[in-house]
Structures are given as structure tokens and as C-alpha cells.
Amino acid sequence: EDTDLLDNYSSYYDYNEKNEAYNPKPELVTRQKELAAVGFEYQYAGEGMGVIKLQADYYATLFVPYVSPEYRDYALIHAAQANEQAVMDGGLMIEYQELGERIAAWEGYLRSYPDSKWQQQVQCRLSRYQFAFLVGLDNSPLFEDGSKKLSQDVAQAWLEFVRRYP
């Protein structure tokens, strides 16, 4: 039932020129409500397609009061970051400074829990964030217009990161 919707996700939105916003069609709103009732949601994945994913705070809401500090911290960091997709279509969807904050959060987690059961997942996410932060992405280069001049927002994010996390 969701195959067409996921393959053609962007076609389930109408563009409203008056407020310059994309509004979901009634069919999508109905499906969104059904998914939300069981802890899932749709997310735009790029290239007109969508995916179904757990709601960002799903695990945190259910388990945080009942689990170890290691799992609690993992769930809380994940919930805080999963609300806003970091990368899509080879481009950074968040500010470089926010990307630095995400890196610091996961580095702090690994320092606090060096033998974490979640180490592989954390390290994978951390490596992707570090790559985007230090090397850039196809559609979010670090340098201005192919020059050797570092983009102003990247330079500021790097300086702020070094200042806050020496």
C-alpha cells in the first residue's frame, strides 16, 4: 500500500503559492495519522522519494525511565538529533555549527561509555558527521565556488568547535 506513496512521495504534496509551503494531500494526512498512532512517520528521502521511520523520540519516550544511563543517553541524543535530517541528496540540511554540536555529543557519549553496546552505531554516525564537517559533501562544499577560500559559515563553525571543545 505504501510502495507508490514512498516512490512518489513528493507528489503527495500540493504547493501553496500564497504561503510558499508544501501541504500534504488528504490521503497522506490520513496515512501520517495511522503511522503516528504506532510510533512511525514518513520522511522525505530526496529525489522525490520517502521512507518510513520511527518517530525521533520513540525509544526515549518508552524506555528512558527504565534503562541504564548508557542506553538513556544514547536514546536522548538520538531523539534530539533525529528530528532534523542532517544530510539529504548529497547536501547538508543543518548548519555547520549544528553539525559540530552533533559531533561533540557523540564524542562525549563515547568518552562516557567507551565499551558501549552502541559503539558501532555511534561510531558510524560520528564518522559520517566528521566527514561532512571536515571534508564537505558533493552539494555542500567547504570552499566557496570551487576556490581555495573556506566558506565563512564553515570557518566560523570550525572556530567555534575548537573553542568549545578543545
How should these model regions be labeled?
Residues 1-48:
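N-terminal Sec/ER secretory leader and immediately downstream segment
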Residues 2-8, 114-119, 123:
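Short, charge-rich amphipathic alpha-helical segments embedded
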Residues 16, 20-26, 30-31, 58-100, ...:
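Short coil/linker segments at helix-helix boundaries
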Residues 65-69, 109-121, 161-166:
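Short solvent-exposed coil/turn linkers within tandem alpha-helical repeat scaffolds
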Residues 119-124, 148-152:
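Short, charged, amphipathic alpha-helical segments
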